[in-house]
């Protein structure tokens, strides 16, 4: 579903937003069509095949991890699904055209797409979940109380 929503929004942006900017919240949120051959914030521009290889390796690792059932809890699986769906959405663009379509613009920050949102929030929530899932690991463990030694034994 993530891949479908991502690809649909990219299709709609390409069909309706080329050369246009639609302001949704002045100064904060716009829809604006651009293409990007890099990653978030236009980093590593022109590295199409690096991203293709990195995504293919990521997908292979995810398949291995899922087969091994290392992630067993629902929150972990939802986060992995979000990251993977976003990665596949951008992977499709890179394979087919070499460019990723971005359309969600925060004027003072960046322009990105639905896949980027799922990758970012999936990764963020996964880190938060991992850091908070076992509160005993983060909390100070109570010190063991010494038992009085029985001198009569």
Indicate residue ranges for each PLM-predicted region.
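Alpha-helical transmembrane bundles and membrane-interface segments of multipass inner-membrane proteins
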Residues: 1-153
């Amino acid at each position: 579903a993530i891949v479908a929503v991502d690809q649909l929004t990219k299709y709609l942006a390409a069909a309706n937003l080329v050369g246009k900017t639609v302001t949704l919240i002045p100064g904060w949120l716009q829809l604006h069509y651009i293409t990007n051959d890099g990653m978030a914030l236009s980093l590593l521009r022109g590295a199409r095949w690096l991203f293709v290889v990195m995504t293919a390796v990521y997908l292979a690792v995810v398949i291995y991890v899922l087969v091994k059932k290392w992630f067993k809890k629902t929150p972990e699986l939802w986060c992995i699904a979000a990251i993977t769906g976003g990665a596949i959405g951008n992977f499709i663009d890179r394979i087919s055209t070499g460019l990723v379509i971005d359309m969600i613009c925060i004027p003072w920050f960046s322009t990105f797409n639905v896949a980027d949102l799922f990758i970012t929030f999936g990764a963020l929530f996964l880190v938060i979940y991992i850091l908070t899932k076992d509160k005993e690991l983060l909390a100070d463990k109570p010190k063991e109380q010494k038992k009085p030694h029985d001198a009569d034994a």
